[in-house]
Amino acid sequence: MYSPSPAPEQRFSDRVENYVRYRPSYPQEIITLLQREAALTPQSVIADVGSGTGISAGLFLRAGCTVHGVEPNRDMRKAAERLLTTDPNFHSVNGSAQATTLPDHSVDFIVAAQAFHWFNTPETRAEFTRILKPGGHLVLIWNERKLDATPFLCAFETLLLTFGTDYTAIRHENIDAMALHSFFGGAYDTFTFANEQHFDFEGLQGRLLSSSYAAAAGQPGHEAMIAELHRIFDTHQVSGQVCFEYDTRVHVGH
């Protein structure tokens, strides 16, 4: 194990390039779902909180929405600005879940994709109530990597349990239905979509190193971790590729 865990707003500063290249996108079906269930339109204003490098923001921008990407990590925020700067509907915001800096009752949707597990729930809920328009929607999204659907995914999970610095402590699977019910303040609906990525070894390594709990080059355990990753890839690859399978969970409430 290496140095103590960095603060959430600093965790991904040295992971940005891999995050941009190798993290999964989100299924287009999410837009269709929100159009049907929550009256999403091209006129909708979105606060994408914990927006990172802009992966989720891009989904809503392609639907014609206005998106305020709220991100406390400077390096992640700058990456999103580079990727999305040509879209006039994207607005980069230096803020956090507890202090978005957005005006009162100014957004139709608050979206948190792959980010809710970093939030301070009571303070975040108060801030979300402040910026959300009456009748607006909260949308929490996760790409949940399947842990044991295939022998490859089982082996990859074992690698994370062996080499991940604080993997078990920060994984979003730790968030249970009670925490979600408390955050939404009542009822919410959950929807699931299939998602997947295919990687050669370079992509698999980049996907691993995009995670804040994976030892970076020069840190203790890195070389042993990459050696094990090579072994796993060589064992399970088919035509030079392995497949990451995800369940994309979408929780919708108010």
Task: Identify the residue ranges that each predicted region occupies.
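A short, conserved alpha-helix within the catalytic core of class I
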Residues: 119-128
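Conserved Class I S-adenosyl-L-methionine
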Residues: 53, 174-254
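Conserved catalytic/acceptor-binding region of the Class I
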Residues: 129-197
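Conserved class I S-adenosyl-L-methionine
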Residues: 1-41
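A short acidic, Gly/Pro-enriched loop at the edge of an enzyme's catalytic core
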Residues: 99-109
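Class I SAM-dependent methyltransferase SAM/SAH-binding core
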Residues: 45-47, 53-99
